[in-house]
Curated annotation (Swiss-Prot):
Name this protein carries in UniProt: 2,3,4,5-tetrahydropyridine-2,6-dicarboxylate N-succinyltransferase
Active site: E196 (acyl-anhydride intermediate)
Chain positions recorded as Mg(2+) 2 binding sites: E180
Subcellular location as annotated: Cytoplasm
Annotated source species: Mycolicibacterium smegmatis (strain ATCC 700084 / mc(2)155)
Pathway field: Amino-acid biosynthesis; L-lysine biosynthesis via DAP pathway; LL-2,6-diaminopimelate from (S)-tetrahydrodipicolinate (succinylase route): step 1/3
Protein family membership: Belongs to the type 2 tetrahydrodipicolinate N-succinyltransferase family.
Primary gene name: dapD
Pfam families noted in UniProt: Hexapep_2, THDPS_M
Higher taxonomy: Bacteria, Bacillati, Actinomycetota, Actinomycetes, Mycobacteriales
Keywords from the UniProt entry: Acyltransferase, Amino-acid biosynthesis, Cytoplasm, Diaminopimelate biosynthesis, Lysine biosynthesis, Magnesium, Metal-binding, Transferase
Residues involved in Mg(2+) 1 binding: D163
Keyword Metal-binding included in the entry's annotation: yes
Length: 314
C-alpha cells in the first residue's frame, strides 16, 4: 500500500467546480485522513498564503487544500485526488501504471487554459473581456489536462514545445522531447530517451530508446483498448513508423512501417505469424520487403542503438 499527500492551491468557480489543483511539493506519505480539506489561517504555508483569494476577473477563488490518498491502488476519490496523482507522475514520484487512474475523465473538468490561469468554459467570452484590461489574453487550449510545465518542471529534461507534454507525463532525467514529440499522461520514459514521435497514454519507453520523427505508439485509449505497450531498452522506432505491440530490448522498427498486433509478419524461416505473437521479444528488426511488400522480422545481433550523449546532457 502506497499513500500520498500534498498541500496545494485549488482554483474553484462560483458553482464549486474545481478547475485545477497545483501541488508544488507532493509526497509519498500520508499526513492525515484520506480526502481533501480546505486550509485556513496558520495551516496555510506562508509561501502559498499570498496566492490565495478571489480573482474577480476569472470569477474564481484560489484556496489552499491538503489532499491525502490512503492507497494509490484505490480509484481517485475526487478531482483534487486526480490532480495529486498527475503531479506524482510528473514529479517522478510514481511511474506510469503505479497509481490507479480509473475514472479520471469523469472527475476532471474541461477548462480554458490561459496565460492568466484556468478559466471556466461557460461564459468565457465574458471572462476574456474582463481579463483584457490586464493585457492580451492567450488561450493555450480547452482540455481536461494542462501543459505539464505550467505545473511541474522536472530536472534533467529538454522539452522543445511545452504544448506537447501533458501533466501526468513521466519524463526521466536525460529525456529530450523535440518539437514534434508528444507525451501523454500516465506515460513516458524510464531513462535517457529521444522523443520525436508520439508516446500515447499508458505507453512506457525504457532507457536508451529513440522514438523517431512522426513515429506513433498506440496507447491504452486507442479504440478503447486495454493493451499496455512497452518499448524496451535501446530500441529505435524509425521516422513515421508505428507500433501496436510491445518491444523487448534492442529492437528496430523500420521507418514508415506500422506494426499492429494483427500485422502478418514473415519470420526468417518463412513462417507467417501475427505480430502480437512476438510482443515483448528482444533483438528483432521489423522491416518491409521492398519487392514483395511483405512485413518481415529478422533477428538482430548485439545491442541496439546508441544515443548521442551530447543531446541528452540536460
Amino acid at each position: 500500500m502506497t499513500a500520498a499527500s500534498g498541500i496545494g492551491l485549488a482554483t474553484i468557480t462560483a458553482d464549486g467546480t474545481v478547475l485545477d489543483t497545483w501541488f508544488p511539493a507532493p509526497e509519498l506519505s500520508a499526513s492525515g485522513p484520506a480526502g481533501t480539506a480546505r486550509l485556513t489561517g496558520d495551516d496555510v504555508p506562508a509561501d502559498l498564503a499570498a496566492l490565495t483569494g478571489k480573482d474577480e476577473d476569472r470569477d474564481v477563488e484560489v484556496v489552499a487544500v491538503r489532499t491525502t490518498i490512503a492507497d494509490l491502488n484505490d480509484k481517485p476519490a475526487d478531482t483534487h485526488d486526480v490532480w495529486l496523482r498527475l503531479h506524482l507522475l510528473s514529479h517522478r514520484l510514481t511511474k506510469p501504471h503505479e497509481a490507479n487512474l480509473d475514472g479520471i475523465f469523469g472527475l476532471l473538468s474541461n477548462v480554458v487554459w490561459t496565460n492568466f490561469g484556468p478559466c471556466a468554459v461557460e461564459g468565457f467570452e465574458t471572462t476574456r473581456a474582463r481579463l483584457r484590461k490586464r493585457g492580451a489574453v492567450a488561450v493555450y487550449g480547452i482540455d481536461k489536462f494542462p501543459r505539464m510545465v505550467d505545473y511541474v518542471t522536472p530536472s534533467g529534461v529538454r522539452i522543445a514545445d511545452a504544448d506537447r507534454v501533458r501533466l501526468g507525463a513521466h519524463l526521466a532525467s536525460g529525456t529530450t522531447v523535440m518539437h514534434e514529440g508528444f507525451v501523454n499522461f500516465n506515460a513516458g520514459t524510464l531513462g535517457t530517451s529521444m522523443v520525436e514521435g508520439r508516446i500515447s497514454a499508458g505507453v512506457v519507453v525504457d532507457d536508451g530508446s529513440d522514438i523517431g520523427g512522426g513515429a506513433s505508439i498506440m496507447g491504452t485509449l486507442s479504440g478503447g483498448g486495454k493493451e499496455v505497450i512497452k518499448v524496451g531498452k535501446r530500441c529505435l522506432l524509425g521516422a513515421n513508423s508505428g507500433l501496436g505491440i510491445s518491444l523487448g530490448d534492442d529492437c528496430v522498427v523500420e521507418a514508415g512501417l506500422y506494426v499492429t498486433g494483427g500485422t502478418k509478419v514473415t519470420t526468417a524461416d518463412g513462417q507467417v505469424t501475427k505480430a502480437i505473437e512476438l510482443s515483448g521479444a528482444s533483438n528483432l528488426l521489423f522491416r518491409r520487403n521492398s519487392l514483395s511488400g511483405a512485413v518481415e522480422v529478422v533477428k538482430r545481433d548485439g545491442t541496439g542503438i546508441t544515443l548521442n550523449e551530447a543531446l541528452h546532457a540536460n
